[in-house]
Amino acid sequence: MLCVDVNVLVYAHRADLREHADYRGLLERLANDDEPLGLPDSVLAGFIRVVTNRRVFTEPTSPQDAWQAVDALLAAPAAMRLRPGERHWMAFRQLASDVDANGNDIADAHLAAYALENNATWLSADRGFARFRRLRWRHPLDGQTHL
């Protein structure tokens, strides 16, 4: 299973971003692949929060269009919504403890726990996820998995 970060969805959605074409193609391939594509609820909510935010985009995505984008992604063959399971809290605590997380690191540890709990590879344009030694992750455009 592969799990994607908020930034992957934002880049794939926003045609005004220079990364759009690469990430749009990537997300379309992942969503229609045989390998499951894990979509944590918090990532989906984060996507809607970012793309509809007037402080982030001069012309934000309308809430209706953002919800439609999520619905279309969830309807894709490989898409799987992920919710915290029985091991999520412990994985989250371990990841946070490993890096002495505070502030924004807490949110990243929480997201990384979805991948850890589901034995998945985390895909993010944020190379800061490398600090989580237990996490298997890769930059979406690199192709090289890091442990």
Curated annotation (Swiss-Prot):
<dbReference type="GO" id="GO:0004540">
    <property type="term" value="F:RNA nuclease activity"/>
</dbReference>
<feature type="domain" description="PINc">
    <location>
        <begin position="3"/>
        <end position="139"/>
    </location>
</feature>
<dbReference type="InterPro" id="IPR002716">
    <property type="entry name" value="PIN_dom"/>
</dbReference>
<feature type="binding site">
    <location>
        <position position="108"/>
    </location>
    <ligand>
        <name>Mg(2+)</name>
    </ligand>
</feature>
<keyword id="KW-0479">Metal-binding</keyword>
<dbReference type="InterPro" id="IPR006226">
    <property type="entry name" value="Mtu_PIN"/>
</dbReference>
<dbReference type="GO" id="GO:0045926">
    <property type="term" value="P:negative regulation of growth"/>
</dbReference>
<dbReference type="InterPro" id="IPR029060">
    <property type="entry name" value="PIN-like_dom_sf"/>
</dbReference>
<keyword id="KW-0378">Hydrolase</keyword>
<protein>
    <recommendedName>
        <fullName>Ribonuclease VapC43</fullName>
        <ecNumber>3.1.-.-</ecNumber>
    </recommendedName>
</protein>
<dbReference type="GO" id="GO:0000287">
    <property type="term" value="F:magnesium ion binding"/>
</dbReference>
<comment type="function">
    <text>Toxic component of a type II toxin-antitoxin (TA) system. An RNase. Upon expression in M.smegmatis inhibits colony formation. Its toxic effect is neutralized by coexpression with cognate antitoxin VapB43.</text>
</comment>
<comment type="similarity">
    <text>Belongs to the PINc/VapC protein family.</text>
</comment>
<dbReference type="Pfam" id="PF01850">
    <property type="entry name" value="PIN"/>
</dbReference>
<keyword id="KW-1277">Toxin-antitoxin system</keyword>
<feature type="binding site">
    <location>
        <position position="5"/>
    </location>
    <ligand>
        <name>Mg(2+)</name>
    </ligand>
</feature>
<keyword id="KW-0460">Magnesium</keyword>
<dbReference type="InterPro" id="IPR022907">
    <property type="entry name" value="VapC_family"/>
</dbReference>
<keyword id="KW-0540">Nuclease</keyword>
